[in-house]
Amino acid sequence: VKKMRKIYTGMVTGILVFSIVSLAAAPDHTHVVKEGLSHFNAWKSQGIEHGKALGLLKQYYVTAGMQVYSAGSDITVIGYGGKSVLLLHESGTWSASGFDSTLFGKPPGTPGGGGGGGGCGSPDTWPTSSSAILLDPFEWQGGVFHNPQLFNAIKSDLQSAGYSVSYYKNTQVTISLIETKLDKGVVFNRGHGGYDSSTRSVIICSGERWSENKYTTEQNNGWVIRAWIDHGGEYYDFFTYTPGLISNYYSDLPNSLIYMESCEGLRNSSMADAWLGAGAGAYMGWSKSVTVVYGDSTAEENFNDLCINGLSVCECVEKGYTSPYTGGKLKYEGTGTLGL
């Protein structure tokens, strides 16, 4: 056992020393991030457990001279002229996994909680617009991420309740679309999300690949940031929006229902507060990570209850939904008696 420990320690130390020496020549944010992710994959392929591999990755970035924040499997790294959030979920979830929150090098912060409160009853208020928009930015990933049956079911239920429905997928879900097309009575987003510990904010991925030369005003204000997701062992970076984007582009929403089928959409109320402050009636989301399959089945049941069975938001949530394996719970903020 001692011999194996020495081999393991030597392997990790060797990787770190070699990597830091190579980075010292020409430090670049993207290069440092990719090098770390490459080692993360290598550690996991060698049989190192996910949580331990995350720990090694955090130490790698700290040793590389970056500021590192951690919230479960969401790692925020800042340095060498850039910032990235790494959504290092395990297979089959909408990105985040794990529930601790740690900042390396500074005192840890304590994010706020999420969830609706107050009494619950039948619907007594509704969106003032009979339009709905459905967003599916990661349909291209295939497997469980490709689920046209879900969108057909939700579209049918919404149309039965009198809503006109538009649908956007993959690269159609741009930051420009998010800035201009979400003024609807219902907004449903099915995609990757996470938590940026450096700002204590929920973040939601678009379907648009990252570029330093686009949306520069949004970047400079922190309204969009760079987040990375894993697909088949490769990592891809996307424009990802923060609560600030919603607060700065919307102010008169039509008492909307915002439904986030994304990991950690209600880890705290930061994203919900932005939507509600912009005029939304209620915001539904998951407190932790959620498996794609369970998130899909819950969303399909919720929209059937809201549109066909006449339930309110709080009545849906009170049925009690907890994601297998992750413990994520469906919650809401805002007006629980909002109906569709």
Predicted feature locations:
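Cysteine protease catalytic core and zymogen-processing segment of caspase-like enzymes
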Residues: 196-285
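A domain-level signal for caspase-like cysteine endopeptidase catalytic cores
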Residues: 35-36, 41-44, 52-55, 103-216, ...
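Active-site-proximal C-terminal subdomain of hydrolase catalytic domains
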Residues: 256-340
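Structured catalytic cores of large enzymes
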Residues: 64-131, 206
